[in-house]
């Protein structure tokens, strides 16, 4: 019998100071983390005789213990609360699902700076521009930059070992700073200066400078140079025509739209830097049942801006579609401390800010509606599959597939679905070794052993295990898994998915461990769910296989050369920029690689020419 928490005795020990509290259930699992300006006052509110919130009632009924940490200020409490939420992922807290850092454009502090995509902590010396909504937006910008400002994008190791310009120089995508005779340090620094201004949003300043350069070149009858400057000017103006610019020029701000319905919330963030819209992203936090919209919005705001704060730029202005219920000053102070400058919230914007907020709210509502419709489709498919397999519930499914080319570079994949669809953070790949090439049974056996031999949490035990294969694959999989499910509280249903002779979608044969075969109509929602998880598993396996095969083939040409071991192979590929670059290198260039003598360079050169 669960022991009732003695709230009266506990509250007598609680201070009126600010701090953080952690609530535990009977299994000593943290189920809620909160902060308070006055701990005693806040914790007492949970144990009043009349509590309106159903969520609070459910939370209190599960409390077995409460730990309290006192802090000096409410700001400290806010940051500590965030750290605890991230550490424990409590059941009753609103949780930020997407905790990935945003990508930036990085301009290195090298003598000849390199421009590249960067994600993560800002530890390298250089300048960071962004954030951008996703890596695709960064790559698109880098591609554009190559055409207008041909600053190098190659790795420093490749740059350091070049004696002649690469293909990027030949097609006008790099100025060629790796070779001193191609461009001077002064001219390259000027080019980098234009790029820096462009990334800072100072397009007009760049245009003024380029127009001046074009006019001077024309006056000096340097018509080729003038034409080059003219092309740069035209390219920048085309970019300006395509890009929406804020009336609040040079301003950095995030605009947060919000929508919540049917247990799904969406916060859409529009990112504006230097007055330009860099892009946007929708977030769908994980919400405990019966959580009100205000708590969702407040919790998301603090978690979002305090997560990865070393890699995330907090803008000076944050536009919100509603007031915060929490202490606004404390949150602003905490974010200002992290950002290193004053951060302000605005909840009743006008002018262009108001239009941005309306746009962000519209996007939040649209994304939420799409999510709800997707969830309804997923729910229908899960119900159909439960009916087909006569199961009471399906909380978790896993699917396995094998990928290789003629037995080479074998990879196994495992993908996971729950009632909301794919759980991509739990996808896994297994590098298969020590088997006969092409032996799919052995590969599947090895993958399943590595997956299930270790102790599993109860919630990680699947209700269904799909095997992408026929009877032989399924039987082998069953032989492996029965060795481990003796201590499991439930036995997964195992289903094989055979593609059939024509391998056309909709004609799959489904096989049980008893050897029974059955088919589902091509329009059956249950079949669509099975096809979805099968395709996810196949794509995950083949992506891993292709990466492994590419890496293997990159080094295989060097493996038969006497005197070239793993370390030297790695050095050769690293310092020349890849196998194709190595094949084009001269003996003298190969000899410049650390650890490679001139005589060995000649052997390598001759071997690669055969």
Swiss-Prot record:
SMART domains: GIYc, HhH1. It comes from the Bacteria. The keyword NAD does not apply. Keywords: Cytoplasm, DNA damage, DNA excision, DNA repair, Excision nuclease, SOS response. Signal peptide: none annotated. Its main location: cytoplasm. Gene3D superfamilies: 5' to 3' exonuclease, C-terminal subdomain, GIY-YIG endonuclease, UVR domain, UvrC, RNAse H endonuclease domain. One of its GO terms (biological process) is SOS response. Residues 16-94 form the GIY-YIG domain. GO terms for molecular function: DNA binding; excinuclease ABC activity. GO terms for cellular component: cytoplasm; excinuclease repair complex. PANTHER family: UVRABC SYSTEM PROTEIN C (PTHR30562:SF1), UVRC/OXIDOREDUCTASE (PTHR30562). The UvrABC repair system catalyzes the recognition and processing of DNA lesions. UvrC both incises the 5' and 3' sides of the lesion. The N-terminal half is responsible for the 3' incision and the C-terminal half is responsible for the 5' incision. This is UvrABC system protein C. It comes from Vibrio vulnificus (strain CMCP6). The lineage of its organism: Bacteria, Pseudomonadati, Pseudomonadota, Gammaproteobacteria, Vibrionales.
């Amino acid at each position: 019998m669960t022991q009732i928490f003695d709230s009266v005795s506990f509250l007598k020990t609680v201070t009126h100071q600010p701090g953080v509290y952690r609530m535990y259930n009977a299994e000593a699992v943290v189920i809620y983390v909160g902060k308070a300006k006055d701990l005693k006052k806040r914790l007492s509110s949970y144990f009043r005789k009349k509590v309106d919130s159903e969520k609070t009632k459910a939370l209190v009924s599960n409390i077995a213990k409460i730990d309290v940490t006192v802090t000096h200020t409410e700001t400290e409490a806010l940051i500590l609360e965030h750290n605890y939420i991230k550490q424990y992922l409590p059941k009753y807290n609103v949780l930020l699902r997407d905790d990935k850092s945003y990508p930036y454009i990085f301009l290195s502090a090298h003598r000849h700076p390199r421009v590249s995509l960067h994600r993560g902590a800002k530890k390298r010396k250089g300048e960071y521009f962004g954030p951008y909504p996703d890596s695709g937006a960064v790559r698109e910008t880098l591609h554009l930059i190559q055409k207008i400002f041909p600053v190098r994008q190659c790795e420093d190791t490749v740059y350091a070992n070049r004696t002649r310009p690469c293909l990027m120089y030949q097609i006008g995508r790099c100025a060629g700073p790796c070779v001193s005779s191609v461009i001077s340090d002064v001219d390259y620094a000027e080019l980098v200066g234009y790029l820096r201004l462009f990334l800072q949003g100072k397009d007009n300043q760049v245009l003024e400078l380029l127009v001046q350069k074009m006019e001077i070149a024309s006056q000096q009858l340097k018509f080729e140079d003038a034409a080059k400057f003219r092309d740069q000017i035209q390219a920048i103006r085309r970019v300006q025509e395509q890009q929406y610019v804020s009336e609040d020029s040079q301003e950095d701000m995030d605009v947060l739209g919000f929508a919540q319905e049917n247990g799904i919330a969406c916060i859409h963030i529009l990112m504006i830097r230097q007055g330009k819209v860099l892009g946007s992203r929708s977030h769908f936090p994980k919400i405990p049942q019966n959580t009100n919209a205000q708590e969702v919005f407040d919790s998301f705001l603090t978690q979002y801006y305090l997560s990865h704060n070393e890699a995330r730029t907090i803008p000076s202005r944050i536009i919100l579609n509603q007031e915060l219920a929490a202490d606004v000053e404390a949150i602003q102070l905490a974010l200002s401390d992290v950002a290193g400058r004053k951060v302000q919230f605005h909840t009743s914007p006008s002018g262009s800010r108001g239009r941005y907020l309306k746009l962000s709210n519209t996007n939040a509502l649209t994304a939420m509606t799409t999510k709800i419709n997707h969830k309804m489709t997923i729910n229908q498919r899960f119900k159909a599959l439960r009916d087909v397999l006569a199961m009471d519930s399906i909380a978790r499914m896993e699917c396995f597939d094998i990928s290789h080319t003629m037995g080479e570079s074998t990879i196994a994949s495992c993908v996971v679905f729950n009632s909301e669809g794919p759980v991509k953070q739990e996808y896994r790949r297994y590098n298969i070794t020590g088997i006969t090439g092409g032996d799919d049974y052995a590969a599947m056996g090895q993958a399943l052993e590595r997956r299930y031999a270790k102790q599993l949490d109860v919630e990680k035990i699947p209700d269904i295990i799909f095997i992408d294969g026929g009877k032989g694959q399924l039987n082998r999989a069953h032989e492996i898994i029965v060795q481990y499910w003796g201590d499991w509280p439930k036995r997964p249903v195992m289903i094989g998915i055979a593609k059939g002779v024509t391998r056309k979608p909709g004609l799959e044969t489904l096989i049980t461990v008893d050897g029974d075969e059955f088919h589902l109509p091509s329009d059956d929602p249950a079949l669509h769910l099975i096809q979805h998880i099968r395709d996810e598993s196949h794509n995950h396996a083949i992506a891993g296989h292709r990466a492994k095969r590419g890496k293997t083939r990159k080094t295989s040409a060097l493996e038969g050369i006497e005197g070239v071991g793993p370390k030297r192979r790695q050095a050769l590929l690293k310092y020349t920029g890849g196998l194709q670059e190595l094949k084009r290198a001269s003996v003298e260039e190969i000899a410049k690689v650390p650890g490679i003598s001139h005589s060995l360079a000649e052997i390598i050169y001759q071997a690669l020419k055969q």
